Curated annotation (Swiss-Prot):
This is Dihydroxy-acid dehydratase. Mg(2+) binds at D83, D125, K126, E444. The keyword Metal-binding applies. Homodimer. Functions in the biosynthesis of branched-chain amino acids. Catalyzes the dehydration of (2R,3R)-2,3-dihydroxy-3-methylpentanoate (2,3-dihydroxy-3-methylvalerate) into 2-oxo-3-methylpentanoate (2-oxo-3-methylvalerate) and of (2R)-2,3-dihydroxy-3-methylbutanoate (2,3-dihydroxyisovalerate) into 2-oxo-3-methylbutanoate (2-oxoisovalerate), the penultimate precursor to L-isoleucine and L-valine, respectively. The gene is ilvD. Its EC number is 4.2.1.9. Keywords: 2Fe-2S, Amino-acid biosynthesis, Branched-chain amino acid biosynthesis, Iron, Iron-sulfur, Lyase, Magnesium, Metal-binding. Binds 1 [2Fe-2S] cluster per subunit. This cluster acts as a Lewis acid cofactor.
Length: 554
C-alpha cells in the first residue's frame, strides 16, 4: 500500500535531495525510511512542571505506533511553561504568550522539515490550544494526544488546595507546619492538575472536537491506557494520511458546537471561551463569544467536578471517562453526530457501542437532574463590558451580586489587600490593566481568588478583571472584560466606592454611575506607558487582539 507523502517527498526524493538524506541517516533513518510518510511528533516534554515530565515517554510510544503502521516518526520538542508555578508572579504574563509560541514552533518545524502528518502531545494548560492552533494552521493530517491527569494528593488535595491554604494560613486557621504539609503532599507526580481545570477542560473539548482518539481526555497520566492511547494515535495518523483527512475537515462549526456543549456539561473553565475562539480562528471558523450563550441556553451542567464540585478527574476516569457523558448528550440531540473525527469515523459511530455509567456513580448526573439547568459560562455585557466579559457562575454563588468597588491596577496589590484583611463583605474587587495588551499577557487570578476562599469570603465578595482566571478558580468572578482598561475601557475609570452589579441571570455587568460622570472620567484618563517595550511580551502586546476575539496574534 502506497501511503501519500505530499510533503516529505519534496525533501528526500531525487538525486538532488542527497544532502537532505545525508542529514537524516545520523538521526536513525534507514534507506527504506525515505519512501515512508514522515510524521512529526510534537512533544511538550519538560522538567519545568509535573504536567509534562512524562511526555517524552509518551512521545516514544507514539513513535512506535507510527513506525509499526508503516510511517517514520520523528520526535521534536516545543516549549511549555507552568501556570501553577508562575501564578501570582510577573512570570504569569508569559503564560498566554506560550500558547502562541507553541503554535508558531509546531508550524515552523513541520513546515521546515516537510512532515506529512503530526501527532502533538500536550499536558499543561496552554499546550492544548497551542498545539491545535498549530495543527489547524498547517492543515496536514494530525492528531492531538492528551498527556493525562494527575492522581489526587493526600486527603484528595491538589495544587488549588495549596493556593487556598495560603489564605487559611493568613487567616490563622492553619499553622506553618500544616501549610508545609499540604505543600509537600498535594501534588503527587506526573500529570495535569486534577480537577475540571483548564487542562482537563481543553483536553475534553479537543476530544469532543474530534481531534483526539476516544477517551484520550480521560486517562491517568501514568497508565497502560495512556501508553496505548499514544501507540494507537501513531497508528491512526496513517489512516488519516491514507484518507487525506485534515484538521479543517474535522474542525468545523458543528464540531466547535460539540466542544462547547461538552465543556458546559462538564462545568469547564472560562479559558475554554478564549481558547476555542482562538482555535476556530486558526481553522477559519467564525466562532464568536455569543455562540457560547446560544448553546448554553440548552445545555445543563451535569458533572460534579472540582473546583466548584466534589470530584477529581481521576475519579471520572474510574467510572468510564467522558465517553458515556458524550453518548448521553448525543442521545439527547445535543451533539452533532455526523462530525468527522481522527478515527476516520463520525462521532456517532465512535459512540455507538459506549456503555452508560453505572447507576451507583454520583459524579455525572442525569440530564433531567442537573446541577445547573443551563450553562455556567455566562457572557456578560453592559457599560463595563461593551464587547463582552466571561463569568463562571455555577449557581452556588447565587445569580447576582451588587457591591462597592475596591480598585487595583495589578494583581499583586489585590492579593496583598486580601491577605491583609482590607477586603470586606460586599466589596467588588476590581483588578485592571491585566488584559492581553495592558498586562501584557492576560494573567490568571488564581492567587487572589484562592486567597478569597481561604479567607472565608467566598460568596461574600465578587472579583472582576480584564485578566483571566485559572480553571481552578471558583466563586463570583468575571474576567475577559472588553474593552480592557489599557485600551480605554470603562474598567479604567471605576473608582473605589462605585456600585457595580453583576447579574448572571440577565447577563449584565454594569457600573452604576451616571453616563455623564463616566464620560467626564474617560475624558481625563490617559493611557499608561507599556510595561514592556522589547522582547516577546512587547511583541505580544502589539499583535494581540481582544479577549473577545481569543487574544489571537494573527
Amino acid at each position: 500500500m502506497c501511503i501519500p507523502r505530499k510533503y516529505s517527498s519534496q525533501v528526500v526524493d531525487g538525486f538532488e535531495r542527497a544532502p537532505s538524506r545525508a542529514m537524516l541517516y545520523p538521526i536513525g533513518f534507514k534507506k527504506d525510511d525515505f519512501s515512508k510518510p514522515q510524521v512529526g511528533i510534537a512533544s511538550t516534554w519538560s522538567m519545568v512542571t509535573p504536567c509534562n515530565m512524562h511526555i517524552n515517554k509518551l512521545a516514544d510510544k507514539a513513535e512506535k505506533g507510527i513506525n509499526n503502521a508503516g510511517g517514520k516518526g520523528v520526535i521534536f520538542n516545543t516549549i511549555t511553561i507552568s501556570d501553577g508555578i508562575s501564578m501570582g508572579s510577573e512570570g504569569m504574563k508569559y503564560s498566554l504568550v506560550s500558547r502562541e509560541v507553541i503554535a508558531d514552533s509546531i508550524e515552523t518545524v513541520v513546515g521546515c522539515q516537510g512532515f506529512d502528518g503530526v501527532v502533538a502531545i500536550g499536558g499543561c494548560d496552554k499546550n492544548m490550544p497551542g498545539c491545535i492552533i498549530g495543527l489547524a494552521r498547517l492543515n496536514r493530517p494530525s492528531i492531538f494526544v492528551y498527556g493525562g491527569t494527575i492522581q489526587p494528593g493526600k486527603n484528595r488535595t491538589d495544587v488549588v488546595s495549596v493556593f487556598e491554604a495560603v489564605g487559611r494560613f493568613s487567616n490563622h486557621e492553619i499553622d506553618e507546619i500544616e501549610l508545609e504539609n499540604i505543600e509537600k503532599t498535594a501534588v503527587t507526580g506526573a500529570g495535569s492538575c486534577g480537577g475540571m481545570y483548564t487542562a482537563n477542560t481543553m483536553a475534553s473539548a479537543i476530544e469532543a472536537l474530534g481531534m483526539s482518539l476516544p477517551n484520550s481526555s480521560a486517562q491517568n497520566a501514568i497508565s497502560d491506557d495512556k501508553n496505548n492511547d499514544c501507540i494507537q494515535a501513531g497508528e491512526a495518523i496513517l489512516t488519516l494520511l491514507n484518507k487525506d483527512i485534515k484538521p479543517r475537515d474535522i474542525m468545523t462549526m458543528k464540531a466547535f458546537e460539540n466542544a462547547i456543549t461538552v465543556i458546559i456539561a462538564l462545568g469547564g473553565s472560562t479559558n475554554a471561551v478564549l481558547h476555542l475562539i482562538a482555535m476556530a480562528n486558526a481553522a477559519e471558523v467564525n466562532l464568536k463569544i455569543d455562540d457560547f450563550t446560544r448553546i448554553g441556553k440548552k445545555v445543563p451542567v451535569i458533572a460534579d467536578l472540582k473546583p466548584s464540585g466534589k470530584y477529581m478527574m481521576s475519579e471520572l476516569v474510574e467510572i468510564g471517562g467522558t465517553l458515556p457523558l458524550m453518548k448521553m448528550l448525543l442521545d439527547a440531540g445535543l451533539l452533532h453526530g455526523d462530525c468527522m473525527t481522527v478515527t476516520g469515523k463520525t462521532l456517532a459511530k465512535n459512540l455507538k457501542n459506549v456503555q452508560s455509567y453505572a447507576d451507583s456513580q454520583e459524579i455525572i448526573r442525569a440530564l433531567d437532574n442537573p446541577i445547573k439547568k443551563d450553562s455556567h459560562l455566562r457572557i456578560l455585557r453592559g457599560n463595563l463590558a461593551i464587547n463582552g466579559a466571561v463569568a463562571k457562575i455555577t449557581g452556588k454563588e447565587g445569580s447576582s451580586f451588587k457591591g462597592t468597588a475596591k480598585c487595583f491596577s495589578h494583581e499583586e496589590g489585590a492579593l496583598k489587600a486580601i491577605l491583609n484583611d482590607q477586603i470586606k463583605a460586599g466589596n467588588v474587587i476590581v483588578i485592571r490593566y491585566e488584559g492581553p495588551v495592558g498586562g501584557p499577557g492576560m494573567r490568571e487570578m488564581l492567587a487572589p481568588t484562592s486567597a478569597v476562599m481561604g479567607k472565608g469570603l467566598g460568596g461574600k465578595i465578587a472579583l472582576i478583571t480584564d485578566g483571566r482566571f485559572s480553571g481552578g478558580t471558583h466563586g463570583f468572578v468575571v474576567g475577559h472584560i472588553t474593552p480592557e482598561a489599557f485600551k480605554g475601557g470603562v474598567l479604567a475609570v471605576v473608582e473605589d466606592g462605585d456600585e457595580i452589579i453583576i447579574d448572571a441571570q440577565n447577563n449584565v455587568l454594569e457600573l452604576l454611575v451616571d453616563q455623564a460622570i463616566i464620560d467626564k472620567r474617560l475624558s481625563k484618563w490617559t493611557q499608561p506607558k507599556p510595561n514592556y517595550t522589547k522582547g516577546v511580551l512587547a511583541k505580544f502586546a502589539k499583535l494581540a487582539k481582544s479577549a473577545s476575539e481569543g487574544a489571537v496574534t494573527d
